[in-house]
Design a protein with these regions (language model features):
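Short, structured coil/loop segments at alpha-helix boundaries
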Residues: 1, 184-185, 255-256
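Aspartyl protease catalytic domain
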Residues: 73-227
């Protein structure tokens, strides 16, 4: 059957005072191209702080009817005493190089919360109750929800990765996101204003949204993901050292290299 076009309605900026030109307008991402005459991804920027204009979140949305999410375990993280080394190459498999659109960071180090992870039946870290879980089914669908909602269907999952509590679930912010920043991590100085990344899914299950926020508290990252269209969203990681989103292309020698980053100075 013919797939429907990939378009998203523009969204109003969260706050008129901090909004910048182009906020909330979805535009195709040339680095990932298109298929069937349709873009594979759309991009927008939002300024979720009511006053500050330096607090911004860049959101990229992927059409999951034309692309798929894969999880690759890191060479060292999440640290595990049970998973086979064969499961943690820390590299995108060569078989996927020709169709690779982008790669981005996963979640916290295992020692920071002991959030669970599983890949192809190998459990790196046991699941933790209350943790937000990004699950990829064996058919390629993506679910983002608290572990309690995913656990019953875990046999259907090819991979799952846990994070701190969902920033946003079923369209509602987490009850602690406005005041309990520690759940989602702080800077070395103990401040909540830091770079953060998030991954969400829309109500249809078709649109995967990745957000990268600069100088952003958890509540403002949640707001940006919600405004962009996420029904549920998980924070992935924090700090400048661990947040990444790279677009790739092959060089003259046929080797993959970073073509561009989602925002400057990510490599």
């Amino acid at each position: 059957p013919q797939r429907s076009p990939f378009t998203l309605p523009n969204v109003p900026p969260p706050h008129a005072r901090s909004a910048q030109p182009g906020d909330g307008e979805w535009k195709p991402v040339p680095e990932v191209g298109e298929t069937e005459g349709q873009p594979l991804a759309l991009l927008t920027t939002l300024h979720p702080h009511p006053i500050r204009k330096d607090v911004e979140v860049v959101v990229i949305a992927f059409d999951l009817t034309r692309s798929e999410l894969l999880w690759v375990a890191g060479a060292k993280e999440p640290e595990s005493k049970t998973a086979s080394p064969e499961k943690r190459k820390g590299m995108v498999p060569a078989r996927d190089h020709d169709r690779l659109l982008a790669a981005f960071n996963g979640g916290f180090m295992a020692k920071h919360g002991r959030y669970g992870a599983m890949l192809d039946g190998a459990e790196f870290v046991p699941p933790r109750e209350g943790a937000c879980t990004v699950g990829i089914t064996k058919t390629g669908a993506v679910r983002v929800a608290p572990w309690e909602e995913i656990a019953a269907a875990k046999a259907e999952l090819a991979a799952w990765r846990q994070t701190p509590p969902c920033l946003l679930h079923d369209g509602q912010p987490h009850q602690s996101v406005r005041h309990d920043h520690k759940k989602w991590g702080l800077s070395i100085e103990g401040k909540p204003e830091i770079r953060r990344t998030a991954l969400g899914i829309d109500a249809s299950g078709r649109v995967l949204l990745f957000g990268l926020g600069e100088w952003v508290e958890p509540r403002y990252l949640e707001l940006a993901m919600r405004v962009a269209g996420a029904k549920t969203a998980a924070q992935l990681d924090i700090n400048w050292s661990y947040t990444r989103f790279n677009f790739y292309a092959k060089n003259a020698e046929g080797q993959l290299e970073v073509k561009r980053t989602l925002v400057p100075k990510l490599v």
